[in-house]
From Swiss-Prot:
Protein name from the UniProt record: Homeobox protein Nkx-2.5
Residues covered by region (Disordered): 90-128
Known function: Transcription factor required for the development of the heart and the spleen. Implicated in commitment to and/or differentiation of the myocardial lineage. May regulate the expression of genes involved in cardiogenesis and play a role in the formation of gut and the pharyngeal region. Binds to the core DNA motif of promoter.
Gene name in the database record: nkx-2.5
PROSITE patterns: HOMEOBOX_1, HOMEOBOX_2
DNA-binding stretch(es), residue numbering of this chain: 124-183
Length: 299
C-alpha cells in the first residue's frame, strides 16, 4: 500500500513549532523592514532627556563595542539607533503645526475666563459715507424726476457721480422714507386735532388728611341749600278768639246748645254745625276764599 500524503493542520503542535522555527530563520533584512514599518507610530513621540541618563551617542558606542566583542551579528548597529535618530531629527516647528484647532479655542476661552473685566473689542463699523454738495444736488434732482431707479439707471448714475451702486440705492431708500414721513406730518397738521381737554380734579386728601371738611376754594355749581319747609306762610287758626274755634273737636246739632271752650290753647277744636255762619264771618274779614282752602288743608 502507498503511504498517504501528510496533511498539515494549522493547529497541531508540529505546525506551531515549525512556525517558531520559521520566524527564527528569517533574514535580518526582513525583520528590519517590518520594524521600520512599525516605527512610524513611535516616531510621533519625542524622546525627552532626563538628568543622570546617558546620552544617545554613549548608548550607540556601548552597543557597537558589544557587537565587536561578541563577534559579527546578524543585525547592524545602525539598526538600533535609526529610530532614535529619526525621532530626534523631527523639527519642533512641524510639531507645533499639528496642534488641534480645538486646543486653540480652549486657550482663547481660558484667557477670557481669566480676564472677565477686560472689555471685548467691538467690531469697527464702516465709516459713514459723506456726499458732496454736487452729489446731493444731482441725487435730489434725479429723485424729483424719478423716485424709483432700475438697476441700469442706478449703475449709470453711480458712474456719473463716482459712487457705488449700493450707495445710490441706499440713498434713494432713505429719501423715500423721509418723503413718506413728511406726508404723514402734513396730514396730521391738516386734520387739526383739538388739544386734549383739561379737567379740574378736586383734591380729596392732602398731606394724609382729608380735605372734605375744609372750605373748598371753588364754588360748586351744585351747591343747593335745602331748608326745612316752613308753615308760616299761612295764618294759624289757633289764634282766633271765637268760641267756635277752640281746641277740642265736638260735633253738635243746632238744637243743642254749643259747649263753651275749655281753654284757648288746646290742640283740639270745638266745631258746631249751627255756628258755621259765625266761623265764616272772621274768615271773610281776614282774607279771601283761597286763604280758607289753604287753612282747611293745613288743618
Amino acid at each position: 500500500m502507498f503511504a498517504s500524503p501528510v496533511t498539515s493542520t494549522p493547529f497541531s503542535v508540529k505546525d506551531i513549532l515549525n512556525l517558531e522555527q520559521h520566524q527564527s530563520g528569517l533574514s535580518p533584512m526582513d525583520i528590519t523592514s517590518r520594524l521600520e514599518n512599525s516605527s512610524c507610530m513611535l516616531s510621533t513621540f519625542k524622546q525627552e532627556s532626563y538628568p543622570g541618563t546617558p546620552c544617545l551617542s554613549e548608548l550607540t558606542e556601548e552597543m557597537s563595542q558589544r557587537d565587536t566583542a561578541k563577534g559579527p551579528s546578524s543585525f547592524p548597529g545602525s539598526f538600533f539607533v535609526k529610530n532614535y535618530l529619526e525621532m530626534d531629527s523631527k523639527d519642533p516647528k512641524d510639531h507645533k503645526k499639528d496642534i488641534c484647532p480645538l486646543q486653540k479655542t480652549l486657550e482663547h476661552d481660558k484667557r477670557e475666563a481669566e480676564d472677565p473685566e477686560r472689555p471685548r473689542q467691538r467690531k469697527r463699523r464702516k465709516p459713514r459715507v459723506l456726499f458732496s454738495q454736487a452729489q446731493v444736488y444731482e441725487l435730489e434732482r434725479r429723485f424729483k424726476q424719478q423716485k424709483y431707479l432700475s438697476a441700469p439707471e442706478r449703475d449709470h448714475l453711480a458712474n456719473v457721480l463716482k459712487l457705488t451702486s449700493t450707495q445710490v440705492k441706499i440713498w434713494f431708500q432713505n429719501r423715500r422714507y423721509k418723503c413718506k414721513r413728511q406726508r404723514q406730518d402734513q396730514t396730521l397738521e391738516m386734520v387739526g386735532l383739538p388739544p386734549p381737554r383739561r379737567i379740574a380734579v378736586p383734591v380729596l386728601v392732602r398731606d394724609g388728611k382729608p380735605c372734605l371738611g375744609e372750605s373748598s376754594p371753588y364754588n360748586s355749581p351744585y351747591n343747593v341749600s335745602i331748608n326745612p319747609y316752613s308753615y308760616n306762610t299761612y295764618p294759624a287758626y289757633s289764634n282766633y278768639s271765637n268760641p267756635a274755634c277752640s281746641g277740642s273737636y265736638n260735633c253738635s246739632y243746632s238744637s243743642m246748645p254749643s259747649m263753651q271752650p275749655t281753654s284757648a290753647g288746646n290742640n283740639f277744636m270745638n266745631f258746631s254745625v249751627g255756628d258755621l255762619n259765625t266761623v265764616q264771618t272772621p274768615i271773610q274779614q281776614a282774607s279771601s276764599v283761597s286763604a280758607l282752602h289753604h287753612g282747611i288743608r293745613a288743618w
